[in-house]
Amino acid sequence: MDSGAVPTNASNCTDPFTHPSSCSPAPSPSSWVNFSHLEGNLSDPCGPNRTELGGSDRLCPSAGSPSMITAIIIMALYSIVCVVGLFGNFLVMYVIVRYTKMKTATNIYIFNLALADALATSTLPFQSVNYLMGTWPFGTILCKIVISIDYYNMFTSIFTLCTMSVDRYIAVCHPVKALDLRTPRNAKIINICNWILSSAIGLPVMFMATTKYRQGSIDCTLTFSHPTWYWENLLKICVFIFAFIMPILIITVCYGLMILRLKSVRMLSGSKEKDRNLRRITRMVLVVVAVFIVCWTPIHIYVIIKALITIPETTFQTVSWHFCIALGYTNSCLNPVLYAFLDENFKRCFREFCIPTSSTIEQQNSTRIRQNTRDHPSTANTVDRTNHQLENLEAETTPLP
C-alpha cells in the first residue's frame, strides 16, 4: 500500500497482513509470516495483533520494547528453526547431488522442496534482527529479496508437492507410461517450470516491496494501488485459491485414485521388492503432503476469514494466530526429519554422512579415482603403461628357480 494508506493508529497491528511499527514483531514463519506484507511490514513488533484485536494494544508492548520473555521465546524459536532448517535441507540437497543412486525423479522433486525451505529459513536471521530492533535496518533491496523469497517458498513448495502427487499417481496407476515420463531429466524441467510459475507472484511482490519511514522506525512492506482494500483482499483470495484450494484438490484426487488402485491389486509390478519400494515411496510422499497441509491450513483459513469478516477482539484469537504462525515455521524444517524416518535410502545416506565408515571412505576414494580417470584419460593411459613396463621389468629381473 502506498504511504498514504499506511495506518497510523493501533488498529492494524493484529491483521495477519499488517505490521505497524507501534507494536512488537510477531514470529514470522517462512511464507505466511511475510504474507503479513499483504497489508503491512516486517518491522511490526507484535505482528498481526492489533487490527485483529479490535484496536486494543493491551497485548502488545510499546514500540521497540518487547518483553524479555517474549523476545527470548521468539529468538529461541527463530534460532532452532533456522539451524535445523538450513542444516537439514542442505543435507538433503547434498545427499541427492552426492549419491548417484539418489538421483531419481522423486528425489529431484524433494531437492526442489528442500531448496525452497532452505531459502525460507535463510531469511530468519534478518527477521530476528528486525524483531529485536523494532525497525528494518537492511535497506530496500534486502526488503524486496526477503519478502519475495517468502512468496516463492510458499508457491514453489505447494506446486512441487502437487507435482510429486501427480508423479506418484503415474507411478502407481500407469506404470508403463511411467517408464517414459518419470525420468530425472523431466523432473528437472518440471522443477524449473514450478519456479517460473511461482514468479507470477514472486516478481510482482518484489517490485511492490519497499521500505517506509513511520513513527521513528523503518517498515519493510508492500505497496498497493488505490483502492488499497480491494487489491489487498484480491491478493489474499488469489493466494488462498491458487496456493491452497486448487493444489489440495489436485492432491486429493491423485491420492484417492492411488488408494483405489492399491486396494484393487495385490501386485503393482512383477517384483515383490519393487512393489514394496513403490508403496513405501508413495507412503512417504503422502506423509510429507499431509504434514504440509496440517501446517498451512490454519493460517490460510485464518487469513481468508479475516479478509471477509471482522473478528472481535479476544485473547484466544491472539494465541490462535501465534499458534498458526508456529505451525508454518515448523514445516520448513520438518521435511528432512520425515525423510530420515520414512525413507531407508535417505536414512542410510544421512548415516554415512554423519558417521562415515571405512568402507564408505574407500568407496568415495574409488569414485574419485574413476572420476579422475574419466577427466584425464591420457594420464590414466600413461599410468597404465608405466605399471605394465614395471611389471615386465620385474619379471625380467626376477631370478629363475
UniProtKB/Swiss-Prot annotation:
Glycans are attached at N9, N12, N34, N41, N49. GO terms for biological process: adenylate cyclase-inhibiting G protein-coupled acetylcholine receptor signaling pathway; adenylate cyclase-inhibiting G protein-coupled receptor signaling pathway; G protein-coupled opioid receptor signaling pathway; negative regulation of cytosolic calcium ion concentration; negative regulation of nitric oxide biosynthetic process; negative regulation of Wnt protein secretion; neuropeptide signaling pathway; phospholipase C-activating G protein-coupled receptor signaling pathway. Residues 365-389 are annotated as: Disordered. A motif (NPxxY) lies at residues 335-339. Residues 1-69, 133-143, 209-231, 308-315 are extracellular. SUPFAM superfamilies: Family A G protein-coupled receptor-like. It holds the Pfam family 7tm_1. Receptor for endogenous opioids such as beta-endorphin and endomorphin. Receptor for natural and synthetic opioids including morphine, heroin, DAMGO, fentanyl, etorphine, buprenorphin and methadone. Also activated by enkephalin peptides, such as Met-enkephalin or Met-enkephalin-Arg-Phe, with higher affinity for Met-enkephalin-Arg-Phe. This is Mu-type opioid receptor. The lineage of its organism: Eukaryota, Metazoa, Chordata, Craniata, Vertebrata.
